[in-house]
A protein has these predicted regions:
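Glycine-rich nucleophile elbow surrounding the catalytic serine of serine-hydrolase chemistry
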Residues: 200-213
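Catalytic histidine-centered segment of alpha/beta-hydrolase-like enzymes
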Residues: 479-490
Length: 508
């Protein structure tokens, strides 16, 4: 395998989130928006666990300003506030967002914890319209008020006034915008005494680490909890870079899980989890040892590892040897089900699709996006227009297309940083050190090939924090992909786990 081919999948984490960000990309509005906020409020009721819960939905744009007080943008959000609570000052409030960088939060909004959700097909392509939008019995409104936020340039959020892309499209710039929004929301709505939570997905977990630390350092706003759905804090753990074997090791147990799911193994065990434990051990011990030897590995050692790797992944020994024991994600997705004329997914590897080119070395598309993207786009537009009474005369942007223009250079603070280092685990560590009562919960999808579970486990076991703080971190696992809430049973489990997390973190 040449270095050039390996570089196709360098920064696999960005590939994961960039697909979400770039999918459904639309042109920006022709005219820059005015700097006046717009709001629409409506009253609703949802029944959760036999309890009728009235709530107010507030959809609108919040004006952001620079340090000189000049307007720079309007950030769109939808807030759901329980309306039968006399004193909201102590009721939990959660801020939710997706990733990208540059993705709207329609996925979490219309799929996870909001009062409504779009119905999709479990692990398969969802047929075209009409799509059903139903009351979401897994909503968290019985536990917390919810504020879904669209990143700048996505949804109905727009750069305005004196603002430019450079003010928002970067690690620290993006976090600063979210921090300003949250601070404004908390002050306007009298929620300073409320337990506060961040719930981010994918790059939204990366953002949460920076944002959680920033809120505490800049605004002295201490959070109760941060819930990370499909987490990535160190992008290098997902990068198939020349000379760096870590990603091959970290991805290997996920390859095994996907091969097991698609029944691509010659000797497929009945139970997944014991099989995954074997795969973890093999990856960390035998596989890692031979990879780290590099060119010093003997032919005998390579053959032995190739045989075991084939048994775990369903790839032929010959293919593994020709790949020099190093199969990157796109190659795996193209090769695993090639004999069936299919490629497997990245965001959710349970999804498969046909391909034009059965000879291609790497998978060029992700079946997941085609599988559910149409349903979510239709649902979020219809819901905003018809129920929230907002945005009918403008475009809801699934993405701002900012991934390729993102500023990864850090501005410093909250730990030791190096320019352009794609790692924010120090931000989270600093947030937990500053606030030793901050709880963190991580939600992992077993079939998530965008942010696999093993690199996440490695990151969270290497935060360098005290043992007492390490106890504040909880790991949860689901037999689903990147968006585990799209699987009916796992959406219930996710809801129960996050509800328990909010209850636990709110008791002080």
């Amino acid at each position: 395998m040449t270095s050039r081919k390996r570089l196709r999948v360098t920064m696999a984490a960005l590939g994961a989130v960039a697909m979400l960000a770039a999918w459904g990309l639309q042109a920006q509005d022709a005219q820059p928006p005015a700097t006046q906020e717009e709001w629409s409020a409506s009253d609703h009721t949802i029944r959760l666990a036999s309890q009728a819960i009235p709530y107010k939905a507030s959809a609108g744009t919040t004006l952001l300003k620079n340090d000189r007080g000049e307007p720079t943008g309007l950030m769109y959000s939808v807030a759901y506030t329980r309306s039968d609570v006399k004193d909201l000052s102590t009721r939990p409030v959660s801020f939710l967002f997706n990733g990208g960088p540059g993705s709207a939060s329609m996925w979490l909004h219309m799929g996870s914890f909001g009062p409504k959700r779009v119905v999709t097909t479990n692990g398969e392509f969802t047929p075209p319209a009409p799509y059903a939008i139903v009351d979401n019995t897994e909503s968290l409104l019985d536990r917390t008020d919810l504020v879904f936020i669209d990143a700048m340039g996505t949804g109905y959020s727009r750069i305005a006034g004196k603002g430019t892309e450079r003010d928002f499209y970067g690690v620290d710039e993006d976090a600063a915008a979210f921090a300003q929004f949250i601070n404004t929301y908390i002050s306007r709505n009298g929620r300073w005494n409320s337990p506060k939570f961040l719930i981010g997905e994918s790059y939204g977990t990366y953002r949460s680490a920076v944002l959680g630390n920033l809120l505490q350092q800049r605004y002295s706003m201490h959070l109760n909890g941060i819930d990370l759905i499909s987490s990535v804090l160190d992008l290098s753990t997902l990068t198939f870079a020349p000379g760096d074997d870590r990603a091959y090791i970290y991805y290997m147990p996920s390859y095994a899980a996907v091969a097991w799911y698609h029944k691509a193994l010659k000797n497929r065990p009945a139970d997944l989890m014991p099989f995954l434990e074997e795969a973890r051990h093999f990856a960390q011990v035998e596989y890692a040892a031979v990879l780290f030897k590099g060119s010093k590995a003997t032919a005998t050692e390579k053959a032995a590892v190739a045989k075991r790797l084939s048994g775990f992944t369903g790839l032929s020994e010959d293919y593994v040897l020709r790949a020099n024991l190093r199969v990157n994600l796109q190659q795996f997705n193209a090769e695993l089900l090639r004999s069936r004329g299919l490629t497997s997914g990245r965001i959710d590897a349970r999804f498969t699709s046909y391909t034009f080119d059965l000879l291609t070395e790497t998978a060029e598309t992700d079946p997941f996006m085609a599988g559910v993207g149409g349903a979510f786009t239709a649902a979020v537009n219809r819901y905003n227009h018809e129920e929230l009474k907002f945005g009918r005369d403008r475009q809801y942007l699934n993405s701002n297309g900012a991934g390729g223009r993102w500023n990864w250079t850090r501005q410093g603070g909250g730990g030791s940083f190096f320019p352009s280092a794609p790692n924010v685990q120090n931000d989270l560590a600093q947030a937990m050190i500053t606030n030793p009562r901050l709880l963190v919960q991580v939600e992992n999808g077993i079939y998530d090939m965008a942010t696999p579970f093993m690199p996440t486990e490695f990151t969270f076991s290497h935060l360098g924090i005290a043992a007492d703080l390490q106890k504040n971190i909880t790991m949860k696992y689901y037999p689903s992909g990147h968006m585990m809430y799209l699987q009916d049973a796992d959406r219930v489990a996710l809801r129960d786990n996050v509800a328990a997390f909010i209850d636990r973190a709110s008791r002080r």
